[in-house]
């Protein structure tokens, strides 16, 4: 028996009785059914603005506005909105694509999202379980195609923000106290890694599940880079060897990336080149998918965006990214008067001007000719994106 009612938006539980009658072989049978409808007490994560990522805690009930793409803002110069619009109008149902803990525990990864998400009235409602971690929920159309998807970051910490001091001693930005998707910023803890992103894309990929190793030296040991392919109770599949289509006109591969949020799109050509577009005009080379103003492709939760230019003192157009020197340049505490970054320790480095720790979480890079692992250089390298445009000679979105 399915009884459909409006959501109980009041503060109290509603009760009632339903009488069901049916006739069989000339005999009428009547049955009373007691109805109980609990108050709808979900926390509206989009109350202060929509985004592609929402922060939740364990053991809660949440909802968010799924009627608009991302933050409802711009799309850089990608022409995506002109072709596909901002509104989500053809959603039919919600589905959990994946849920995963940082350690890749496949049993506990099922405890991040509790049950199936529900899509109704332009909102997605979901419950969280007993485990922290990350997940992605999608809204699909009646044919089962993904219309849009959202990153759910389940973390019980109070995530805070503070001033970032640049090389000149000025406040360059107000930044989060950890990586996007991280459970902490504790050195040598796998929970500090956060999520991985292809530049300009809104959907996350999971970093390696391997523990940090103190002897990491950048040699890319496979045992230190075990991929995290857990999906919990999700229905999706991780794909790392897909090649982006050769499309020279914006919005190029953006629709493909939205349809396939769990697919890492390799460049159609060998090397670290764009997944987005193979064209050579400014719209293709500098599309502003992440830009000075938050876009619909920005992966950050409400109140945050991808960092802007010169966050770590590298001016736009400067091909040099040298930010550290020889061991002799540092004192016994790992600090150098010459460099902004302290010496490497505990699989990361600290920004001298604030003391913030930046873990070396590695990267994802998979090709058919270099296949060390899906994850690479965990604990030995770090790659941190900004919205800053790069010179044409070094343009890369992968």
Annotate each predicted stretch with a short phrase.
Residues 1-4, 41-125:
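Surface-exposed binding patches on compact interaction domains or structured appendages
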Residues 8-9:
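Solvent-exposed segments in extracellular or luminal domains encompassing
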Residues 12-25, 132-142:
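A short beta-strand micro-motif common to beta-rich folds, especially ectodomain repeats
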Residues 29-41, 145-159:
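C-terminal edge beta-strand
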Residues 67, 129, 140, 155, ...:
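Structured loops at beta-to-helix junctions and adjacent beta-edge loops in soluble globular domains
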Residues 121-149:
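Surface-exposed interaction regions enriched in Ser/Thr/Asp/Glu
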Residues 123, 133-135, 162-322:
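Short aromatic-cysteine micro-motif
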Residues 182, 260-398:
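C-terminal, surface-exposed recognition/capping segments
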């Amino acid at each position: 028996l399915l009884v459909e009612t409006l959501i109980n938006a009041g503060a109290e539980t509603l009760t009632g009785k339903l009488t069901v009658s049916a006739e069989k072989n000339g005999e009428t049978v009547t049955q009373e059914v007691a109805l109980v409808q609990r108050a709808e007490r979900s926390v509206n994560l989009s109350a202060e603005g929509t985004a592609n990522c929402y922060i939740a805690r364990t053991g809660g009930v949440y909802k968010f506005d799924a009627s608009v793409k991302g933050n409802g803002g711009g799309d850089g110069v990608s022409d995506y909105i002109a072709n596909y619009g901002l509104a989500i109008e053809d959603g039919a149902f919600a589905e959990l694509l994946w849920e995963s803990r940082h350690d890749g525990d496949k049993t506990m990864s099922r405890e991040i999202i509790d049950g199936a998400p529900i899509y109704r009235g332009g909102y997605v409602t979901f419950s969280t379980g007993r485990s922290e971690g990350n997940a992605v929920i999608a809204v699909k159309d009646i044919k089962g195609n993904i219309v849009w998807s959202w990153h759910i970051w389940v973390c019980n910490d109070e995530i805070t923000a503070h001033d970032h001091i640049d090389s000149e001693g000025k406040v360059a930005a107000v930044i989060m106290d950890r990586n996007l998707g991280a459970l902490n910023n504790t050195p040598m803890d796998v929970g500090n890694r956060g999520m991985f992103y292809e530049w300009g894309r809104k959907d996350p990929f999971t970093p390696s599940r391997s523990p940090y190793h103190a002897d990491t030296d950048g040699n890319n040991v496979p045992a230190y880079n075990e991929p995290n392919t857990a999906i919990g109770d999700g229905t999706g599949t991780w794909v790392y060897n897909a090649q982006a289509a050769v499309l020279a006109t914006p919005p190029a591969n953006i629709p493909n990336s939205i349809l396939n949020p769990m697919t890492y799109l390799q460049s159609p050509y060998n090397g670290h080149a764009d997944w987005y577009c193979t064209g050579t005009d400014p719209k293709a080379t500098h599309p502003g998918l992440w830009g000075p103003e938050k876009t619909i492709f920005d992966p950050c939760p409400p109140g945050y965006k991808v960092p802007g230019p010169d966050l770590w003192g590298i001016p736009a157009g400067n091909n040099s990214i040298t930010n550290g020197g020889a061991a002799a340049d540092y004192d016994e505490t790992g600090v150098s008067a010459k460099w902004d970054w302290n010496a490497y320790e505990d699989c990361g480095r600290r920004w001298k001007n604030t003391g913030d720790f930046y873990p070396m979480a590695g990267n994802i890079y998979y090709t058919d000719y270099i296949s060390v692992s899906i994850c690479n250089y965990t604990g030995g390298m770090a790659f941190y994106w900004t919205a800053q445009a790069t010179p044409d000679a070094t343009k890369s979105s992968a």
